[in-house]
Amino acid sequence: MSSIQQNIEHITSQIRYDEQKCGRTPESVQLLAVSKTKPVEAILEAYQAGQTAFGENYVQEGVSKVQHFAEHYPDNRIEWHFIGPIQSNKSRLVAEHFDWVHTIDRTKIAQRLNDQRPSELKPLQVLIQVNTSGEASKSGVTEAEVFELAELISRLPNLTLRGLMSIPANVSDYESQLHEFQKLATLKQTLEAQFPEIDTLSMGMSGDMTAAIEAGSTMVRIGTAIFGARDYS
C-alpha cells in the first residue's frame, strides 16, 4: 500500500470518527484532496486509491492537470475544484475546465464565469467565499454582502450556487476554531431560508478539521496530510 493511499485511509477514518462523535450523519463530509504543486503521478495514485475530488489553486497548473487526465484517462471520474483566487483574465480557463469553484467573491467574476461556461458542459457548481475573520489579507465578501451576491448567482443559468467557503483566522485552540467555523455555519442556515438548494460548507483543513466538522462542514480541504509537504521551487 502506498503512503498516499495510507494517508487517505487515515484521514477518511478520522473524518468518520469526527462525524460519529458529533452526531453527524455518516459520510456527510467529503474529502477534497488539495493537489496544488503536486505532480500528476501523485494525483493518479490518490485516484487509484479511491479519491475522486481534487482541489487546485493555480489556474495554469490546474488546467494542465485537467487536460492530462482527459487525454490519458478519458473515462476518469475526477471532479476538479478550483479553490484559489480568480483573476479576470484567467476566468475563461476556470469556466472551461473546472467542475466547482470555491472562491467567488465579486459579481464581476460570477458574471464572467457564467458567460464563459461552455454550453455543452453542466452548470459550474459554485461557492461564495466569505471573509469571516475580517482580516484584510484574506479574500471574500463580508457577511453583509453574501445575500446580494447569492441573489445574482441564482439568476445566472450557467452557475449553480451550492453554498459557502471560508479560510478562517489562524488560531490554534479548539474553541476559537469552532467559533470561527460556527459563523459560516450560521450564515449558511440563514441563507438557506432564501436559497433552499444550497447544501455545501467548504471549511476545515489539516489543523482544524475536527472543529470544522463539529460546526457543520460538508467538505474539508486536505493537502499536506495526503501528499506530503509542498514543493514551491
Swiss-Prot record:
Gene3D superfamilies: Alanine racemase (3.20.20.10). Keywords: Pyridoxal phosphate. NCBIfam families: YggS family pyridoxal phosphate-dependent enzyme. Belongs to the pyridoxal phosphate-binding protein YggS/PROSC family. Pyridoxal 5'-phosphate (PLP)-binding protein, which is involved in PLP homeostasis. This is Pyridoxal phosphate homeostasis protein. InterPro entries: Ala_racemase_N, PLP-binding_barrel, PyrdxlP_homeostasis. It comes from Vibrio alginolyticus. Coiled coil: none annotated. PROSITE patterns: UPF0001. The modification N6-(pyridoxal phosphate)lysine is found at K36. GO terms for molecular function: pyridoxal phosphate binding.
